[in-house]
Amino acid sequence: VDAGPTADGSGRVRTLDALLPLLVEDDERRADRVVAQLLDPTAHGGPAGPTGVHRAEPVFDPDAYWRGPVWPQLAYLMVQAVAPRSPGAAEALVRTTVAGAWASGMAEYWNPDTGAGLGAIPQSWAGLALVLARQSTGGAFGDQPVDCG
C-alpha cells in the first residue's frame, strides 16, 4: 500500500498518514487492503485505536510521539474514509478510538494497546473521539462500558 515516488525516502516506513489516500480511493481492491490493515492487530489495529506506524516496522514504538501512538485526528480521518465502504469496519475503528480517548483522559495522543495518555492531557483534538461516538450507529454507546482490552 505504501509505495510510489517516496518509497526510497520517508515513505519507506509504513504509516497511518500514508493510508489517507483512502479518502479518495476508487480502486476497491486497494481500499479493501487498507481497511484490512487498519483492523489487523499485526498491522495498524489496536484496542485503543489505529497505530500511527505499522507494528512490523523497526521504528514502531507505541509510546514515542510519531512512532506508533494513536493520534485522534488521523483516526477520525480514517473513520471518514472507511465508513462509506465498510460501516462495520468504521464502527470498529470508532469503538477503539473512543476507548483510547476515554482511557487516556482525552490526551493529545495515546498508546494503541493500553490507552495510556501521552502528550498534553487533556488536549482539544481528542474531542474528535466524541464526534465519532456521536456519529456512530451506536450513538454515544449508551451505557456500554468502554474498554481498551
Name each model-derived stretch.
Residues 1-70, 96-149:
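Extended glycan-interaction surfaces of carbohydrate-active proteins
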Residues 69-104:
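Extended amphipathic alpha-helical segments enriched in small hydrophobics
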